[in-house]
């Protein structure tokens, strides 16, 4: 029985047995299906030809070859093996328990048959469910030839395979299921009813040549013996019938006179396969027969009907047609023979199917998990069988010449005997899982993915060398009977084996793919068995009486056991021990203290003797390569040292038992070392490819990210909101992962190399997956495997008291958050201040339990109350800085070059503050922990009480590290000297350690006071740093707003929970009268409309006069329309009851966001041709015409005329619009008021539009319908008299010499800036404003060139002012220019030119100017105060609330507003509000359109009034020339550094330093000069941290 696993069934013996036996007998087991064949079946498989008699065979299963087996047929191969190609269909006749199956294949071209044995793992079942389905009992009924049935149903119930009795052994063509069934069908049709004899009427006679196998004739433990009988058909031919013995509930009763037919299925349960598996199955079957798919109705769980597609040949269903290559068109012999098509593809059962219960359409990951679980179960069963084998049956590896072949070729070469190295069910399930599940690979320990220690082991060869080194060293220590060092190195051996097993576990997919799992399991069993024996026997030996007696009587010859507490150790050759420094650190030192002796004995155990290891031992260990011989094992053992035992009598019983144990340990070491080398030989020769990198065994940080535990890093490359991810605000589903940090789409994605590693370990390709889809797929796909991403458990855990984790709240970076922090910091100061703190007063009391309890309770209460401070630091919303970083890395196409330069400059200044923030956050974590520990220590009399609980080994001692004997440092000439210096330094440090020497006893009270002081200071400093972050945020937003870069503002604020402009949110109440008063014109008559609407409701109008879509409108609390459907809005626009002027203006301005132009005109025409309701009397009809139809017609005409007159632009033109000319002619014929004007406008705007010149935007006023044109002639109160203007002489003087800026009067300069700005402002049109809000979402509005010019002029003015100052080398000139521009800005404010005023103020507060301390020192205090007031006016806090209040007071005068406010209003109103209300798709959010229309109207309203200022060409020329070729802010900053270099103690100017800035400098300087050292080095400006790059 020793070679039962290396044999196959002997078919020749089976034939002889079959010919000798004529007695029918049947024996079966409960779990094995037996088949019966006649003698002619064996004859059909012989090589001798005979007449072509048909033989009917019923297979017990059908599989498709997954790999080539025994192909091509070799001369020396066994004739009993079946030769198949990948994709061929194999009909199974018998399944042996050894894993070998008896099967046959049929040649499509000639119908010849080849039969033989093949391993079960080379076959892939067509479907797992169809064999069970076809084994159900059939209902008897007769059917005609047109009966629709499944071919597999016929096969599985009544049809047999009719094969010729003289098959050829020649090579066949490809075989498919459809071809074989077609042959069977044709054979059945030609032979009639008597061709098949039912199982019930068939006697059993001659045995099957390959199925009837007895234990005497085969080495297989077969569970079934078969007997067959011969039956003659009507034509005298011999026929063989084979059938499986069914279970009790699966019988097939059919007589020979009945035809086979399909079951009557009214509701068939099916299983739909995914598209990937369908394509995999079909592409794996090569055939020249076209595959046919039939649509089948399907009943879903919701009783809905839909179509699925059914393949009759393969008996599979799918939800959509697969895309596969056309093998017929791609065939090479297409010209030789015509393509074949299935002859019976119409015979398909078209009854409705139903999905299997609890089996929806499964994805590949689900089936992969199922197959893996089945595989694991089968592997456990095989392990149980293997455990019954004797230990003497050692494993061996046949080192063939072809060991580099792949898996399938190894089977072909080695034969069936090699199949038993892996269990057959395990291999079968492995193949199925590889077909369905995606391939996975472990995350390797690569330096470009992880941060490794310098001595981390990253290669399998390194781990092998370390294991062998520890093994030989432990063996040597045992031979020298050094118990301490033997225990140490034996523990290290165990650790290395654990890590080896963990590495194999992580590479289980690669090992299974190479079919080496069972062999590796056996090796690990041997390793663990040897370790167990060594551990037990070594303890028995060292604890034996013989060993103790020997140690007592041993002389001092053995130097290894005499070295105690020495500073250096020597080996047998006198060399210093290789790992002496490591041993000194890892082994605890003995310590004695003078005062506290209560824990002296338990503090640290005394150091015992050290054994020496020759450093050359490691060099003698050769790395085992793939070609190294396994038997070349080198061990440090030569023989048992007889001198060790010669002094003891051999007759001593203790001597004999000890020697026996000694020898057993010695032998087990040799076995263990042999198993180690055997394991790595198998791994390197079969599993590893070119790279032998280890999987990542130890916890190490990913490169490019650091975030975990209580530390949150929002700049991490893969932070998630609820889960720590970064996406664009998408919901998390079961098939995709979102990765959004606080709904922030701007956070960086996972690094590519890290994403590739995670995706590969999860079985997905990172190239085809987006980074936001990796995490969930990874965790979903790997939930059933060993590797689970992010260390999540691979099984479901249930905790009875588990709390549902709530999403942490993000604290906005605002003043409110800062005030909360300051409040908590003040509480900390009151309680723990060193001078007046309540808690510190307790510490001065005498030591007692009451005093200690009060200290602990007060401290815990204080920490519990102030934990909010730590939570704010961890969850502070830094989205604006994250967006800033991402905009620098991936600039948006919407940003210009100037904005990109500003972002880089801003990041360089912000990064230092952010670095200080993270430093203070870490310091706060540390001080909280220290405060808790010092509070607890106040209750201890001995502060070293718990030191005995400290581990004897440092952190990471058990982790595998490279042995330093292999490093160049050890092998260098200075190693000995460095080793001695290191040992000396180590002992010096130990001698100075207070814990061991008690130089100074720790005072718990003083330590607690110091911790409280640091706690107070750090909490205060945290508030200062957050205040600086808020200031930096405001500076960013101020710049973006003042430079009118609304796109930059939107990008910076993306993802913030606290919206900067709250009033633009839909949640902002429409009832806010303060907001609406500024944007609603009273002339539009909203109040009159509400009153008239209420009056109409009270009148009880007849039903046919009411509005049809009134119920589809949504009103707010003030009666204004908030939303409605398109029909309701058009009806209200042309209402017959009253005119809503405000609504009409909004509708005509924003209609393009609701309807297309053609839809708008057609909706009005449809409204004009309104039909009367049914059932009206003659009088009611006349009333309807008079009071509803005619008013509506008039409203339609007026709306069209107004629209074409005031709100039309060429960009609204669409094909088909000129057709409304016919409508206008009809209106004229009906004599509707205003019809002729409408006809004229249509001819002008629509018909002759292309022939007319474009209208000058400067002369166009988009709100002329509401505003009287006479207002334009009104004189502005702000004007300049002729006396105030420069005289003609002055003008001549300016022309005679070159003008200098300081020569121009500031007021004159301000007036000319106002003239220039106002001229540009008048060119802005309504449609350009809409273009800024909508872009091209609804239509191409033609761009906004005039707005672009206006913004560019203002920004250039800003750069000009700052550049003019910074380019001056003389500090006095810079100060004069600064005061000059402050005066110009003030005059601009007086002229209501807020645009130029803001540009100048922004320039003076820019970083190149703001940092010029020497310049600002020379500026007068009056100018500084004036500039400060102007800056406060344009403060962006609360959405420019101060500026808005001032602008609201500017009425009926000329004005140039600051356009950045309007751009922000348009942008955030459009983005911050939905297009539809109530999450619907038809109720349009009209309030959003109203807000946009009000903003546009306010912009246009400032064009009504004009300045009465004279344009001075000379000064205009100077201004225009100065605004050309001005450098950007980055260049100006370089000039600023040249004129005033950066000083070490200067952080900014003093004229505008806030109180918080002063406090910051004060605290930073204090902490820099901390008495105990540099506690926090926050005073100096740090370079930009890599964290933000």
UniProtKB/Swiss-Prot annotation:
Sequence positions bearing Phosphoserine: 151, 154, 423, 580, 596, 632, 649
Residue positions, PTM Phosphothreonine: 635
Transmembrane segments: 1452-1473
Keyword Cell division included in the entry's annotation: yes
GO molecular function terms noted in the UniProt entry: guanyl-nucleotide exchange factor activity
Additional free-text comment from the UniProt record: Present with 319 molecules/cell in log phase SD medium.
Name of the molecule in the record: Cell division control protein 25
Organism: Saccharomyces cerevisiae (strain ATCC 204508 / S288c) (Baker's yeast)
Gene that encodes it: CDC25
């Amino acid at each position: 029985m020793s070679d039962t696993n290396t044999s196959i069934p002997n078919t020749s013996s089976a034939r002889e047995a079959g010919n000798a036996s004529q007695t029918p007998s049947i024996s079966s087991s409960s779990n094995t299906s037996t088949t019966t064949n006649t003698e002619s079946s064996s004859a059909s498989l012989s090589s001798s030809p005979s007449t072509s008699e048909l033989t009917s065979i019923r297979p017990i299963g059908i599989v498709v070859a997954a790999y080539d087996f025994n192909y091509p047929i070799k001369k020396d191969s066994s004739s009993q093996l079946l030769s198949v190609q990948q994709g061929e269909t194999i009909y199974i006749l018998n399944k042996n328990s050894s894993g070998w199956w008896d099967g046959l294949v049929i040649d499509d071209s000639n119908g010849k048959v080849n039969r033989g044995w093949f391993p079960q793992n080379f076959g892939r079942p067509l479907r797992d469910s169809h064999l069970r389905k076809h084994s159900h009992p059939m209902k008897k009924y007769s059917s005609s030839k047109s009966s629709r049935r499944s071919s597999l149903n016929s096969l599985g119930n009544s049809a047999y395979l009719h094969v010729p009795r003289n098959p050829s052994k020649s090579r066949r063509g490809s075989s498919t299921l459809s071809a074989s069934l077609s042959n069977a069908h044709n054979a059945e049709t030609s032979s009639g009813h008597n061709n098949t004899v039912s199982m019930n009427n068939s006697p059993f006679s001659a045995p099957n040549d390959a199925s009837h196998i007895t234990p005497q004739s085969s080495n297989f433990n077969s569970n079934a013996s078969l007997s067959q009988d011969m039956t003659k058909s009507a034509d005298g031919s011999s026929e063989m019938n084979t059938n499986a013995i069914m279970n009790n509930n699966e019988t097939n009763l059919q007589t020979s006179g009945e035809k086979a037919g399909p079951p009557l299925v009214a509701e068939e349960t099916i299983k739909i396969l995914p598209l990937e598996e369908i394509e995999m199955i079909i592409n794996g079957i090569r055939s020249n027969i076209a595959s046919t798919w039939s649509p089948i109705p399907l009943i879903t769980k919701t009783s809905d009907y839909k179509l699925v597609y059914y393949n009759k040949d393969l008996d599979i269903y799918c939800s959509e047609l697969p895309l596969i290559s056309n093998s017929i068109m791609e065939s090479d012999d297409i010209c030789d023979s015509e393509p074949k098509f299935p002859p019976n593809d119409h015979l398909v059962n078209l009854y409705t199917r139903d999905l299997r219960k609890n089996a929806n359409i499964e994805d590949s990951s689900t089936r992969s998990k199922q197959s893996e679980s089945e595989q694991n179960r089968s592997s456990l069963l095989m392990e149980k069988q293997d455990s019954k084998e004797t230990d003497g049956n050692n494993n061996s590896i046949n080192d063939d010449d072809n060991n580099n072949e792949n898996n399938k070729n190894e089977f072909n070469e080695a034969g069936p005997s090699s199949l038993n190295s892996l269990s057959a069910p395990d291999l079968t399930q492995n193949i199925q899982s590889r077909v369905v599940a995606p391939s996975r690979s472990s995350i390797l320990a690569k330096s470009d993915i992880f941060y490794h220690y310098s001595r981390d082991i990253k290669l399998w060869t390194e781990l092998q060398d370390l294991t062998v080194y520890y093994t030989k060293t432990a063996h040597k220590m045992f031979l020298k009977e050094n118990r301490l060092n033997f225990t140490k190195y034996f523990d290290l051996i165990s650790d290395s084996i654990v890590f080896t097993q963990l590495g194999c576990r992580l590479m289980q997919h690669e090992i299974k793919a190479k079919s080496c799992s069972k062999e590796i399991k056996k090796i690990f069993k041997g390793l663990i068995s040897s370790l167990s024996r060594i551990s037990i026997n070594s303890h028995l030996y060292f604890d034996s009486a013989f060993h103790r007696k020997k140690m007592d009587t041993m002389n001092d010859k053995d130097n290894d056991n005499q070295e105690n507490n020495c500073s250096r150790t020597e080996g047998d050759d006198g060399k210093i021990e290789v790992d002496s420094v490591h041993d000194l650190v890892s082994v605890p030192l003995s310590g004695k203290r003078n005062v506290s002796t209560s824990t002296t004995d338990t503090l640290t155990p005394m150091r015992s003797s050290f054994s020496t290891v020759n450093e050359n031992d490691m060099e003698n260990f050769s790395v085992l390569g793939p070609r190294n011989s396994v038997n070349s094992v080198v061990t440090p053992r030569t023989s048992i040292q007889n001198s060790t035992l010669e002094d003891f009598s051999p007759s001593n019983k203790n001597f004999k038992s000890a020697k026996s144990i000694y020898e057993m340990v010695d032998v087990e070491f040799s076995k263990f070392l042999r198993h180690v080398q055997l394991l790595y030989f198998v791994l390197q020769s079969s599993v590893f490819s070119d790279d032998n990198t280890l999987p990542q065994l130890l916890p190490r940080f990913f490169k490019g990210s650091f975030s975990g535990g209580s530390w949150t890093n929002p700049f991490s490359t893969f932070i998630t909101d609820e889960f720590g991810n970064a996406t664009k605000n998408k919901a998390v589903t079961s098939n995709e992962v979102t990765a959004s940090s606080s709904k922030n789409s701007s956070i960086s994605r996972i690094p590519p190399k890290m994403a590739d590693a995670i995706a590969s370990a999860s079985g997905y390709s990172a190239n085809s997956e987006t980074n936001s889809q990796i995490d969930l797929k990874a965790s979903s796909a790997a939930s059933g495997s060993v590797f689970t991403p992010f260390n999540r458990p691979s099984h479901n855990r249930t905790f009875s008291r588990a709390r549902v984790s709530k999403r942490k709240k993000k604290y906005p970076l605002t003043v409110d958050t800062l005030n909360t922090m300051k409040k908590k910091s003040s509480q900390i100061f009151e309680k723990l201040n060193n001078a007046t703190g309540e808690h510190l007063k307790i510490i001065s009391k005498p030591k007692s339990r009451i005093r200690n309890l009060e200290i602990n309770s007060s401290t815990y209460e204080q920490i519990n109350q102030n934990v909010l401070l730590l939570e704010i630091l961890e969850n502070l919303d830094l989205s604006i800085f994250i967006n800033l970083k991402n905009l620098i890395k991936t600039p948006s196409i919407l940003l210009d070059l100037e904005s990109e330069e500003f972002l880089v400059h801003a990041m360089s200044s912000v990064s230092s503050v952010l670095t200080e923030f993270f430093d203070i956050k870490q310091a706060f974590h540390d001080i909280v922990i220290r405060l808790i520990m010092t509070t607890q220590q106040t209750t201890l009399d001995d502060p070293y009480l718990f030191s005995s609980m400290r581990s004897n080994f440092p952190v990471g001692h058990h982790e595998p590290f490279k042995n330093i004997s292999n490093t160049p440092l050890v092998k260098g000439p200075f190693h000995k000297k460095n080793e001695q210096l290191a040992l000396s330094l180590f002992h010096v440090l130990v001698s100075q350690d207070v814990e061991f020497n008690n130089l100074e006893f720790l005072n718990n009270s003083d330590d607690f006071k110091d911790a409280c002081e640091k706690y107070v200071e750090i909490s205060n400093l945290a508030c200062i740093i957050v205040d600086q972050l808020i200031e930096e945020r405001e500076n960013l937003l101020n710049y973006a707003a003042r430079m009118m870069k609304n796109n930059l503002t939107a990008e910076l604020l993306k993802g913030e929970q606290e919206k900067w402009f709250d009033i633009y949110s839909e949640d902002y109440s429409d009832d806010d009268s303060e907001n609406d008063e500024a944007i609603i014109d009273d002339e539009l008559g909203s109040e009159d409309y509400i009153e008239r609407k209420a009056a109409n409701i009270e009148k009880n109008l007849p039903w046919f006069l009411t509005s049809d879509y009134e119920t589809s409108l949504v009103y707010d609390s003030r009666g204004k329309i908030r939303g409605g459907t398109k029909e309701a809005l058009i009806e209200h626009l042309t209402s017959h009851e009253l005119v809503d002027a405000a609504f009409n203006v909004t509708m005509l301005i924003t209609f393009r966001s609701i309807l297309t132009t053609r839809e708008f005109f057609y909706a009005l025409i449809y409204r004009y041709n309104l039909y009367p309701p049914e059932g009206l009397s003659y009088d009611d009809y006349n009333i309807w015409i008079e009071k509803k139809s005619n008013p509506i017609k008039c409203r339609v005409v007026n709306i069209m005329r107004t629209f074409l007159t005031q709100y039309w632009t060429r960009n609204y033109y669409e094909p088909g619009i000129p057709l409304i000319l016919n409508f206008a002619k009809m209106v004229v014929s009906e004599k509707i008021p205003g019809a002729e004007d409408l006809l004229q406008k249509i001819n002008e705007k629509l018909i002759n539009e292309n022939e007319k010149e474009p209208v000058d935007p400067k002369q166009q006023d988009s709100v002329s319908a509401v505003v009287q044109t006479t207002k334009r002639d009104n004189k502005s109160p702000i004007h300049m008299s002729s006396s105030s203007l420069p005289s003609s002489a002055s003008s001549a003087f300016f022309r005679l010499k070159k003008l200098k800026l300081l020569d121009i009067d500031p007021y004159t300069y301000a007036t000319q800036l106002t003239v220039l700005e106002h001229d540009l402002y008048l060119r802005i049109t309504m449609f350009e404003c809409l273009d800024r809000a909508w872009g091209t979402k609804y239509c191409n509005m033609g761009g906004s060139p005039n707005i672009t010019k206006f913004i560019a002029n203002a920004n250039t003015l800003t750069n000009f002012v700052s550049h003019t100052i910074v380019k001056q080398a003389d500090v006095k000139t810079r100060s004069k220019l600064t005061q000059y521009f402050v005066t110009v800005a003030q005059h601009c404010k007086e002229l209501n030119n807020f645009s130029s005023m803001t540009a100048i103020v922004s320039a003076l507060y820019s970083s190149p100017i703001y940092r010029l301390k020497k310049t600002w020192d020379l500026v007068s205090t009056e100018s500084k105060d004036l500039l400060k007031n102007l800056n406060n006016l344009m403060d962006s806090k609360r959405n420019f609330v101060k500026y808005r209040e001032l602008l609201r007071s500017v009425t009926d005068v000329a004005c140039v507003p600051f356009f950045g406010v309007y751009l922000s209003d348009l942008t955030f109103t459009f983005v911050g509000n939905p297009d539809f209300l109530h999450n619907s798709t038809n109720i349009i959010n009209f309030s959003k359109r109203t807000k946009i229309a009000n903003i546009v109207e306010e912009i246009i309203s400032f064009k009504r009034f004009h300045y009465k200022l004279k344009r001075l060409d000379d000064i205009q020329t100077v201004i225009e020339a100065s605004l050309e070729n001005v450098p950007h802010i980055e260049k100006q900053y370089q000039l600023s550094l040249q004129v005033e270099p950066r000083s070490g103690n200067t952080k900014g100017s003093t004229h505008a330093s806030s109180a918080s800035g002063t406090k910051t400098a004060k605290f930073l300087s204090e902490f820099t000069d901390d008495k105990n050292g540099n506690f926090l080095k926050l005073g100096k400006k740090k370079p930009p941290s890599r964290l933000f790059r």
